Structure formats: C-alpha cells, structure tokens
Regions:
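Post-cleavage N-terminal segment of exported redox proteins
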Residues: 3, 11-12, 16-113, 166, ...
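Acidic (Asp/Glu) carboxylate-rich active-site/surface patches
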Residues: 8
Length: 209
C-alpha cells in the first residue's frame, strides 16, 4: 500500500498556527520543515501492526514535491516528476490484457492492505473514483467515467500500453495525480493490472457495453 499522504495533516497543523487565516478554500503554505515535523510525529505515534509497516509514513520524492507545491507544481517540476515516474514502470513481456471478469472483481473490491487483513491480493477500489459499468448504483466522481473506454479509444497495443502504465503509475502521466500508483507501490500485481486493462479494453467487458 502506498505511504500516507501527509498534506491534509500538514495543512491542518499550519492553518492553526498561521495568522491571519488563509481563505477557506486555499491551502496553507507547506515547508520542508513542516513535512519533517509531521513525519516525526507520525513515526512517534504510529506503531507497526500486522502488515501495516512504518514505511507507510515515509514520503518519497514525488510525495514530498507534491506536498510542497500543494499538488500543483510548476511546469518544470511537473515534467521532472513525470519523467522520473515513467522510468519506474515495468511493462511485462507479451500481452498486456488479462481477464476482464477478474478485472471487474478487482475494480469493485476495496479490501486489502489493512493491518487486520491477511496478506493477499488487494482490490483496486476503482469504483470509488470512477464509473465502471452502466448499471452501477453508486460510484465516485473524483476521476472521469470509464464507460466506453475501449470503444472510444480502441484496444490496440499502444492503448494497452497506455492503460497498463496509467494503472501502474499514474503520476508518470499527470504529476501529483490523486490516482494511486498501484504497480509502483505494489498494491496490485502484474497479473491484476493486466486484468484491469482487460476490463477497460475487452469488447465484452461491461465498460464497453
């Protein structure tokens, strides 16, 4: 599971100590010292339990930059982030498409990676942010609807590679994206990512019906 994003906590701490108060919809400025202090507090107060290890409170370079720039870095920083993250993507040999039925189960599942879960393959919780099928009774809207993804964009090799890479590490395509870096942070396995790609691409998938 990816390490925790600390910006909401940092923002709350800074907003309580900054005068005058920033507008309600504005993020208080976060500094490197703020990040160090909050990380120190989390390391002090959080404890390893089950599969939830302390590395989850560590920020990597991307998270640090995104926090410092309130998820809206300058163009040169964004380009640097995307290039670095693109280099982390590991494409498997052969086909990038798995089983769409398995992919749908992954997309609908939010289980896994909690301290009290048994270590096993996790779900992707894709429905929390995206519409996946036409008959879903509820879905999130943080991300775009995925209805008709393969029908609209095609399912050729280049689009398969794009979809695999996007699921593997979304920040290779959009710096500071809210989408989890499923492959980079080992939330989903290689086969699971292939299955999600199949969900997006297969003509028989509910995404494309």
């Amino acid at each position: 599971m990816r390490p925790l994003y600390l910006l909401p906590i940092v923002a709350a701490v800074v907003s309580c100590t900054t005068a005058p108060q920033a507008p309600q919809d504005a993020r208080p400025k976060v500094t490197a010292i703020d990040l160090e202090q909050v990380t120190a507090v989390l390391k002090r107060d959080f404890h390893e339990r089950g599969q939830a290890k302390m590395n989850r409170v560590e920020l990597d370079d991307v998270q640090r930059l995104c926090n410092l720039h309130a998820d809206n870095p300058p163009a040169d920083v964004a380009k640097r982030i995307e290039e670095a993250q693109m280099n982390t993507i590991r494409f498997p040999e052969g086909s990038l498409i798995g089983n769409w039925k398995a992919g749908e189960k992954i997309a609908q599942s939010g289980r896994g990676s909690m301290w009290n879960d048994k270590p096993s393959d996790a779900g992707g919780s894709c429905y929390n942010c995206h519409q996946i099928g036409p008959h879903e009774t509820s879905h999130g809207t943080l991300g775009p609807s995925l209805l008709g993804f393969g029908k609209k964009r095609g399912n050729g090799p280049e689009m398969q590679k794009y979809a695999y890479g996007k699921v593997y590490n979304s920040q290779a395509f959009s710096a500071c994206s809210s989408m989890p870096r499923f492959g980079h942070n080992k939330v989903l396995t290689e086969q699971q990512i292939k299955d999600v790609v199949a969900l997006l691409m297969d003509p028989e998938s509910p995404v494309n019906k």
